[in-house]
Amino acid sequence: MRRALLLAALLACAPPAFADRLKDLTTVAGVRSNPLVGYGVVVGLSGTGDGNSQLTQQSMQSLISRLGLSVETGDLKAKNAAAVMVTADLPPFLKIGQTLDVTVSTVGQAKSLKGGTLLMTPLMGADGEVYAIAQGNLVVGGLGVEGKDGSSLTVNIPTVGRVPRGGMVEKMVETPFLETDHLVLNLNRGDFSTAAAVAEGVNRTFGPDVAVALDGTSIRVRAPADPAQRVSFMSLLENVEVDPAPPVARVVVNARTGTVVIGGTVKVTPAAVTHGSLTVRVTEDQRVSQGASVVVGNNATVVAPGEPVVTPDSQVQVVEEPAKAFVFDPGVSLSSLVDAINAVGASPSDLVAILEALREAGALRAELVVI
């Protein structure tokens, strides 16, 4: 009897089939990356810089003046330098002195950043504060060459490069992770049923009234006040497994490529579909005939070859395919519908037209998204 009760308890606590971890379904409110941006100069280019760009010349003059040197803008040539924008994402909890990757993109007429070096560039957040400093040698995956006759060859994008670990954090971003007595989990895809399932799964693991669903996206979870315990609690929380609700029935159609993505819960009501197609073919051809010229002389007539004559020949052909009819039983899946349409050789455009018509008729039990 005791073994039976223990087995029943273990089965009750076991995660449901096809369950997902909370770390795959949710994010913690306030724990996110922050975009950084800065303006800088890349030097050391092999003649592929901005040339006589006034913006780059002024930037170089300002940079040189900060080093204690005085130079006129007209004396600077930007053939080996380029004005660039530097961007990066500052991950949460990154500490002062740690590094991050930065992306460098040209803003002027530079043809390539290959072989360049990014000079010290402050990276600012949306509040105007400097959070990191970027500097280092660029890694450029593209290639761009140009001949003296004006011919050029470009492979990939040579005007964008990266500096691996080229940014150093100078200021941390404060997060509310340790400031309140609770955490808020936000679903990646809002759904009331999934929010309720998450709250139920957390309460089943940590005890009643620990989590409560605020709406279809957010779930509030009580957390320990001690920072050390909160980190351990979060490591357990993000590994709680729940069974998310089935997604909303949705059909996504790419009208340009004919790609159709169908959710597993999509159904159609009883419907009859008739669809025919009209094909118009226009062919252009040219007929060439040898013209003839007549020469009369000495009581004789001579026919000599003349200039070739080109005559256009256009043909228009209209082909109307016989209409094809489909009848579907109640509750048939949309995948069966698509299989039936494809079996008769319908084109992707025909499939898109049929799906849109089913939606307008109210026979498609799903949201149709056309991209």
From Swiss-Prot:
What's the protein here called?
Flagellar P-ring protein
Give the UniProt entry's GO cellular component terms.
bacterial-type flagellum basal body, distal rod, P ring; outer membrane-bounded periplasmic space
Originating organism: Cereibacter sphaeroides
- In which compartments does the protein localize? Periplasm; Bacterial flagellum basal body
Q: What does this protein do?
A: Assembles around the rod to form the L-ring and probably protects the motor/basal body from shearing forces during rotation.
S-S pairs: none
Q: Which UniProt keywords apply?
A: Bacterial flagellum, Periplasm, Signal
Q: Does the keyword Signal apply?
A: yes
- What processes does the entry annotate via GO biological process terms? bacterial-type flagellum-dependent cell motility
Q: Which PANTHER family match?
A: FLAGELLAR P-RING PERIPLASMIC PROTEIN FLGI (PTHR30381), FLAGELLAR P-RING PROTEIN (PTHR30381:SF0)
